[in-house]
Amino acid sequence: MAERSQNLQDLFLNSVRKQKISLTIFLINGVKLTGIVTSFDNFCVLLRRDGHSQLVYKHAISTIMPSQPVQMFEGEEA
């Protein structure tokens, strides 16, 4: 049977969400955001920092840099 595969973007965002890894997100206009992903969908990422949430649209994101290595697959060393 064929398994349903997840795309890399969803695997990455779900991993950093579950592991509560702090991220730096650079937007296409140069703005730098930091925080922890609390949720995401096809269009946006909910970022939390200092008790405040920010809804960031994915089309505005240029780069995402985690503050530590991300383990995306079971048994994989980060």
UniProtKB/Swiss-Prot annotation:
GO terms for cellular component: cytosol. SUPFAM superfamilies: Sm-like ribonucleoproteins (SSF50182). Keywords: RNA-binding, Stress response, Virulence. GO terms for biological process: regulation of DNA-templated transcription; regulation of RNA stability; regulation of translation, ncRNA-mediated. It comes from the Bacteria. Disruption phenotype: Cells show increased sensitivity to hydrogen peroxide and decreased survival at pH 4.0 during stationary phase growth. It is less able to withstand prolonged starvation. It fails to replicate in cultured murine macrophages and is completely cleared from spleens and livers of infected mice 10 weeks after infection. The keyword DNA repair does not apply. Residues 10-70 form the Sm domain. GO terms for molecular function: RNA binding. RNA chaperone that binds small regulatory RNA (sRNAs) and mRNAs to facilitate mRNA translational regulation in response to envelope stress, environmental stress and changes in metabolite concentrations. Also binds with high specificity to tRNAs. Contributes to long-term survival under nutrient deprivation, to stationary phase-dependent hydrogen peroxide and acid stress resistance and is required for prolonged survival in the intracellular environment of the host macrophage. Belongs to the Hfq family. NCBIfam families: Hfq (TIGR02383), PRK00395.1 (NF001602). This is RNA-binding protein Hfq. It comes from Brucella abortus (strain 2308).
